[in-house]
């Protein structure tokens, strides 16, 4: 009586609408939406197959948007609810071969950043969940795909990132069960972070990335400021 399994294809608007309706018919409400569907795509930018990239974005970005839009009317009516969008450490720091995947996750993060400000006055909360490397099936089967249009000039740089070339599968430090518990615990806390980064290595990576960005801003601050009108103009 407390669980309901439904079929949901985030690339299908009809599937999304039907799944949400089934949940409402069963429980009367949806208090928490977790957008966790997604997969990886490894490719140098030039190698990217546009249809594959469009499907990636449909799964990682547009599908979650459709789900958000499907649950918000009821959440607005009840003046409560939580929307958790799962992204990736890649959204903070893209790697070679991950530009398309990272950009889809970064787009979801920035969308959530705006969404949380729009929903706060309505009593609804939104948060980004940004996991690092976790011991899941991400590197197995269809969870990680790669371009079929490989270009030899990129092999030395991108080759190691291609599906099938990973040496540390199922040795990641992140424990998915612990991550799930942390997410549940945080949702029960009124003081939600904008971004909940998961994993010690992920926190270190984000800090390093932010420090590098600050250093770059400082280095180029004078050049950046030179574009402003002179005082009095």
What is each model feature region?
Residues 1, 22-33, 41:
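A glycine-rich helix->loop->beta "capping" turn
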């Amino acid at each position: 009586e407390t669980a309901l399994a439904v079929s949901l294809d985030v690339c299908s608007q009809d599937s999304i609408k039907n799944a949400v309706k089934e949940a409402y018919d069963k429980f009367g409400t949806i208090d928490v939406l977790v957008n966790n569907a997604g997969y990886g795509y490894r490719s140098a930018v030039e190698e990217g197959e546009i249809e594959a990239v469009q499907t990636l974005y449909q799964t990682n970005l547009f599908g979650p948007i459709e789900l958000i839009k499907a649950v918000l009317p009821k959440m607005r009516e009840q003046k409560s609810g939580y929307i958790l969008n799962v992204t990736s450490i890649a959204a903070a720091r893209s790697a070679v071969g991950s530009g398309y995947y990272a950009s889809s996750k970064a787009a979801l993060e920035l969308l959530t950043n705006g969404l949380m400000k729009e929903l706060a006055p309505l009593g609804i909360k939104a948060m980004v969940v940004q996991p690092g490397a976790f011991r899941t099936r991400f590197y197995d089967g269809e969870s990680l795909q790669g371009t079929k249009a490989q270009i030899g000039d990129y092999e030395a740089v991108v080759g190691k990132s291609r599906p099938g070339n990973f040496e540390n599968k199922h040795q990641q430090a992140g424990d998915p069960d612990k991550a799930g518990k942390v997410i549940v615990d945080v949702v029960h806390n009124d003081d939600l972070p904008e971004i909940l980064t998961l994993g010690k290595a992920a926190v270190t990576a984000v800090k390093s990335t932010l420090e590098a960005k600050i250093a770059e801003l400082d280095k180029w601050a004078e050049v950046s400021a030179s574009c402003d009108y002179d005082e009095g103009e």
